[in-house]
Amino acid sequence: MLLALAQWLQGDASFLRLFTYLTFRAVMATITALGIGLVCGPWVIRKLTQMKVGQAVRKDGPQSHLVKSGTPTMGGVLILIGIAVATLLWGDLTNRFIWIVMLVTFGFGVIGWVDDYRKVVYKDPRGMSSREKYFWQSVIGLFAAVYLAFSVSEANNVRVFDLFMAWVRSGLSMGLPARADLMLPFLKSISYPLGVWGFIVLTYFVIVGASNAVNLTDGLDGLVIMPVVLVGGSLGVFAYVMGSSVYSKYLLFPHIPGAGELLIFCSAMGGAGLAFLWYNTHPAQVFMGDVGALALGGALGTVAVIVRQEIVLFIMGGIFVAETLSVMLQVSWFKYTKKRYGEGRRLLKMAPLHHHFELSGWKETQVVVRFWIITLMLCLFGLSTLKLR
């Protein structure tokens, strides 16, 4: 919004040229989202408390968590407000990637809000049924996947629908340009062509998978938000590189016109996340709930797809991956042993993984900070793929 205003008034005031610089707008988006979160945080927490949207704690979880029962949840709305205002103020609103990321983020946020609402109203820690939640995630994920298959391929925003129709007329067999290939980290001249169907399937699983992985990780005070900020910031760097014809050429990456604007979104997400951490750090005054976790995970997955860094997201989001795998392995092993031996057995003391470490003697703050450190190391490793190719 401010970019369009600055471009309109630039002839009358040359200092407004500053607003056209992507890096300046990214910094301002961070400050704006951070300021909104810090200022509005107490009001949001107070309103959530008045609405009696207290967290229902699992009775089969660690006993130390029982004291958290009643802590306001659905605090993810504070993050989404900061992201929305900062992105709309400082982003280029003609950019197609900004809008698709916002659509996925807030679409998944609505799903999470409904899930949280059911948990609060019916006092059921499980919320929406897995089938219902997965259905709506799939609707949004598939829509985004189909759109991105052609918008990433098209250098300009004017022929996306034409490209889609050309694919239909080709009998759904048309390929995609090299910029839509799956990039392999550390290999500068090798990529895997996906085709339209491959792109759609991969994108769907990345977006939906990232959303659920972040949601599973959200189980301790401050645990998930810092990894989201770190991974989001790292993806913002990739977006800046991919969106620049100069840097992408120098670093031997495909140039994706318009992708650089995602730096604004990632910066807003970082600022909003840090503001939320102010109130979510141990002992938490508010929990983000599914409204925040599902939205942020979907956002990370969508940005990673646009900048063609799905594998790097897998690396940098290693904590999210480990948490998800711990649940999958725990459930699978329990079902297998119950069928084989007549009683279910567990691989871990409890899943997700952070609860296993809690029950192994780690304090909650130890688990959180150590997971942060691991994520920082993984993000630095992921960023190294920019040059080590």
Swiss-Prot record:
GO biological process, one term: regulation of cell shape
Domain of life, per lineage: Bacteria
GO annotation, cellular component aspect: plasma membrane
Gene Ontology molecular functions: metal ion binding; phospho-N-acetylmuramoyl-pentapeptide-transferase activity; UDP-N-acetylmuramoyl-L-alanyl-D-glutamyl-meso-2,6-diaminopimelyl-D-alanyl-D-alanine:undecaprenyl-phosphate transferase activity
Cofactor: Mg(2+)
Catalytic activity: UDP-N-acetyl-alpha-D-muramoyl-L-alanyl-gamma-D-glutamyl-meso-2,6-diaminopimeloyl-D-alanyl-D-alanine + di-trans,octa-cis-undecaprenyl phosphate = di-trans,octa-cis-undecaprenyl diphospho-N-acetyl-alpha-D-muramoyl-L-alanyl-D-glutamyl-meso-2,6-diaminopimeloyl-D-alanyl-D-alanine + UMP
Major location (coarse): membrane
SS bond list: none
Record-linked InterPro entries: Glycosyl_transferase_4, PNAcMuramoyl-5peptid_Trfase, PNAcMuramoyl-5peptid_Trfase_CS
Transmembrane feature ranges: 25-45, 73-93, 97-117, 135-155, 190-210, 222-242, 258-278, 286-306, 311-331, 366-386
Pfam families: Glycos_transf_4, MraY_sig1
Keyword list, A-Z: Cell cycle, Cell division, Cell inner membrane, Cell membrane, Cell shape, Cell wall biogenesis/degradation, Magnesium, Membrane, Metal-binding, Peptidoglycan synthesis, Transferase, Transmembrane, Transmembrane helix
E.C. no: 2.7.8.13
Pathway field: Cell wall biogenesis; peptidoglycan biosynthesis
HAMAP family xref list: MraY
Function of the protein: Catalyzes the initial step of the lipid cycle reactions in the biosynthesis of the cell wall peptidoglycan: transfers peptidoglycan precursor phospho-MurNAc-pentapeptide from UDP-MurNAc-pentapeptide onto the lipid carrier undecaprenyl phosphate, yielding undecaprenyl-pyrophosphoryl-MurNAc-pentapeptide, known as lipid I.
Similarity remark: Belongs to the glycosyltransferase 4 family. MraY subfamily.
Record protein name field: Phospho-N-acetylmuramoyl-pentapeptide-transferase
Species the sequence originates in: Burkholderia ambifaria (strain MC40-6)
Lineage: Bacteria, Pseudomonadati, Pseudomonadota, Betaproteobacteria, Burkholderiales
